[in-house]
């Protein structure tokens, strides 16, 4: 299992890890029963940072696209904000709009439906922030609670301990690279300023070349197990 360090300067970080394809499938199966399912699927299939996912709003998610346009516009997610101090994404180039794979569209539709069904139960306590991922009363998710729920999923998947939500981003890079996506395209999908960042931080997960994002993720996850 590849291990690499992704930590702010001057701080000691836990080595990040990447899921294998078999582990990814086990994770997705286990996540299906979790309220965090759409969070896991979106993070894994788009590479969105965990601090970006926690503040993602529904008005930045297009689950329909424009299939009749010329050329057709696929369903997409616009990543413009982050839970970082100041609310901005990590860098200006971190602002990006990424196509959504079919598995992410399905998970988000189901999540949106459940959220709409559960909202009346909160009654007057509901706070409408328009968040895709929120508490039972509409408030932003706490990072510690996300980590706790995610670890329940990895344990249910038989993956053991020590995993964190940010490992989903490493898995995204690994799956994209294994699918033949060039490092330049992976850097753009991941919201990196330059390929050097991708190559440094995710160096053990990168492989040589060819193709693009949502289509590759659909092909990888839809392919039969060996």
Explain the meaning of each model-derived region.
Residues 34, 208-209:
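Alpha-solenoid repeat scaffolds
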